[in-house]
């Protein structure tokens, strides 16, 4: 019985470690533009996301009618881990896009080791640009994408992802 409890404890403890730590733990300052090109450090598609994260995501498929072609059906993939969610949109033609997300868990790591729990100072040190940190919310806006970083008590508390396309 003790052996089973020990094994379960180990599985829970090591259940969500990043697979590719060397690619993420760079800590050399990068520009906001470089960050927004590949915020996860890999292509933003379902296969890459599944292969490059080790969190035990629950995946749910949601069907949606294509607004331009109502006879066609697209699919939204919802990846859930605890209170965090990442959504991918897959068109009827097979194109995939990172649609949206909310990250509330430190085990979901973005490029340059940006993650929930990071101090404001360490967050600023990850970027070569001067960041306007006058408030507890910072938005990084790129071509068709917006990342909102929300701080509480000088620690990164939440990351919101909003991508838009037509």
Task: List each model region and its residues.
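Bacterial Sec-dependent N-terminal signal peptides
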Residues: 1-25
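N-terminal leader/targeting segments
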Residues: 3, 10-11, 132-133, 138-142
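Short helix/turn-capping signatures at newly exposed starts of structured segments
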Residues: 17-136, 155-166
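Short, exposed beta-strand-loop hairpins at the edges of beta-sheets
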Residues: 137-155
